[in-house]
């Protein structure tokens, strides 16, 4: 029984990672068979873990929020840790493109996820900003919500324009934080 639970957890982790990669490559409408193939499992396993596409999207969203919130930034200076975290945040934003298509923005799930996102990521960003400001590496007047909103807005253009380089624009924004 314990082996089965370990296998189920491993399959779920593989599915979440595979779905996140598929969503980046093809959006949240990526075929379930492609996600299953990336994870090395059968299509039935996908549906056992996530009965609907919305369930899968919500799980990937939460998984990505947790990965961003719990990122290991040890050994990095304050500014380098902030810059690395923002890179991870951009990865998360790219993954979540199309969430509104899978979940209606007026649905309770959408509101709960947005609150979850803010509750988990704002404090992390705030701590990183405070550390970088205390180290004298960035200006001290930047608020976490402002920065996250700015990064998010810079990432929006990438969804519809393959020539749009959100990472470059975000890198310019982050460089502009320097004191």
Language model features: what each stretch is:
Residues 91-127, 152-160:
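Short secondary-structure transition hinges
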Residues 1-29, 33-38, 55:
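Basic, helix-initiating cap at the start of DNA-binding domains
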Residues 40-50:
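Short hydrophobic/aromatic patch on the recognition helix
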Residues 2, 91, 123, 127-138, ...:
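C-terminal peripheral helix-coil segments that are non-catalytic and often amphipathic
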Residues 59, 70-95, 109-113:
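Hydrophobic alpha-helical connector segments
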Residues 52-57, 68:
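Short amphipathic alpha-helical segment with a characteristic S/N-K-E followed by hydrophobic residues
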Residues 31, 69, 98-104, 141-142:
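Short, hydrophobic secondary-structure boundary micro-motifs
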Residues 27-28, 48, 139:
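Helix-turn-helix/winged-helix DNA-binding modules
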């Amino acid at each position: 029984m314990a082996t089965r639970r370990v296998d189920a957890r491993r399959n779920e982790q593989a599915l979440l990672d595979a779905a996140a990669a598929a969503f980046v490559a093809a959006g949240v409408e990526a075929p379930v068979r492609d996600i299953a193939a990336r994870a090395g499992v059968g299509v039935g396993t996908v549906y056992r873990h996530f009965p609907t596409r919305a369930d899968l999207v919500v799980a990937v969203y939460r998984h990505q929020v947790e990965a961003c919130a719990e990122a290991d930034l040890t050994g990095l200076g304050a500014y380098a840790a902030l810059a690395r975290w923002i890179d991870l945040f951009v990865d998360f934003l790219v993954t979540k493109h199309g969430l509104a298509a899978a979940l209606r923005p007026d649905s309770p799930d959408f509101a709960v996820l947005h609150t979850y996102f803010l509750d988990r990521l704002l404090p992390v960003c705030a701590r990183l900003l405070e550390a970088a400001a205390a180290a004298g590496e960035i200006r001290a007047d930047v608020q976490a919500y402002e920065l996250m909103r700015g990064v998010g807005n810079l990432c929006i253009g990438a969804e519809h324009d393959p020539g749009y380089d959100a990472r470059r624009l975000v890198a310019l924004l982050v460089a502009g934080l320097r004191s």
